[in-house]
Structures are given as C-alpha cells and as structure tokens.
UniProtKB/Swiss-Prot annotation:
Organism field: African swine fever virus (strain Badajoz 1971 Vero-adapted)
Molecular function (Gene Ontology), one example: ubiquitin conjugating enzyme activity
PROSITE patterns: UBC_1, UBC_2
Keyword Nucleotide-binding belongs to the record: yes
Catalytic activity as recorded in UniProt: S-ubiquitinyl-[E1 ubiquitin-activating enzyme]-L-cysteine + [E2 ubiquitin-conjugating enzyme]-L-cysteine = [E1 ubiquitin-activating enzyme]-L-cysteine + S-ubiquitinyl-[E2 ubiquitin-conjugating enzyme]-L-cysteine
Family per record: Belongs to the ubiquitin-conjugating enzyme family.
pH dependence: Optimum pH is 7.5.
Disulphide bond pairs: none
The EC number(s) this enzyme carries: 2.3.2.23
InterPro entries found in the cross-reference section: Ub_conjugating_enzyme, UBQ-conjugat_E2_core, UBQ-conjugating_AS, UBQ-conjugating_enzyme/RWD
Name under which the protein is recorded: Ubiquitin-conjugating enzyme E2
Residues annotated as domain UBC core: 1-160
Amino acid sequence: MVSRFLIAEYRHLIENPSENFKISVNENNITEWDVILRGPPDTLYEGGLFKAKVAFPPEYPYAPPKLTFTSEMWHPNIYPDGRLCISILHGDNAEEQGMTWSPAQKIDTILLSVISLLNEPNPDSPANVDAAKSYRKYVYKEDLESYPMEVKKTVKKSLDECSPEDIEYFKNAASNVPPIPSDAYEDECEEMEDDTYILTYDDDEEEEDEEMDDE
C-alpha cells in the first residue's frame, strides 16, 4: 500500500515542481527519497541548499516519515547527527501520533514545514543544546555574531557539496520565488476522516454570496 501512495505523491511533485525543494527517489527502493531544501529568503539560511534523506515506514501514510539532514546543520532543533525535532513528524506512540501526525499530510507540506523551521527555531525544545544557547544569545542581542557565523558556515558548506546541476536548478527557480509562510505546516482547511475538506470563507465572500442569492 505504501508504494501506491508514494508513487502518487512522487508523480504529483514531478508534475508540479517547487522552487523551494528538489526531490529524487532511490531507483531500487521507493521508500527512500533524497531531497534538497533551499534556505528561505531573507534569513540567515538564504543561499543554502541543504541535503536530507526521507525514509517512509511500511505504515505510511498512517505513520510519519523520518527526515534526516545529511548536510551539516547548525540549528536548535536539529541533532548533530542530522535527525530532526519537529512536531509534525512525531509519531512514536498512538497518543503522540494522534496529536501531531495525520495521514492527510503530504510530503510537500512536510518539506515546507522543515524549511519554515529553519528560520523559526524552538529553543525551548532543543535537539542541539549548544545551538540553542547561541540562538538565545542572538535573539536577546547578547551575541549577534556567533550564531549567524555558524549558520553561514553551513550555508557555504552546503553549496560546496552540491552539484553544478543542482545549483543551476535552484538558480533558475529563484527568479520569482514567493515567500514561504511561517505557518506553512498548519492545515489551511479542516481535515475530515474521509480526507475531504471543509473550505472556509471570508466574511466579504459570505456577504457577496448572500447578495447574489437575494437577486
């Protein structure tokens, strides 16, 4: 079953390429994906092309995938070995999974969540204690140099590790890239058990609909 879901998602992403990430699939194992995430514009991570691996469990989409950075990262919520600490991918037990993971989540939503996390760390739940301490000092203007300097090192190293083809891909895509919303990981509509959605309307739209009905 997992293969059916992944083939559909992969096909959708290939037909609708993103300016913010690039994906490739292990030819021998569709449950293993390689991704490159573009550092969000106007942030310390801008210009970086960070590599990661995504592993999908046999229970997917009823259990979350695991994302591990292979590029060196300096971030409060990324372990030194590349493992990621983000609520959207928590699913170690039924209670936790019910609170944070939904089968309706798609891989593009996950990747946008990770990109958003780069610029919006949660230092209160650190995976890298040293990075979290450095980030706090940066936020409270106690040390404005150390954290940016370490991040910029990872940006440069990520580019050194990328192929010219990958760099060219993102260079061409960066000409008109929309900003990534800070709440990209949040559902834009209410999920239902049958994977259909209830769309919400703005007040102005409701008023227009009422006027049309009166006519």
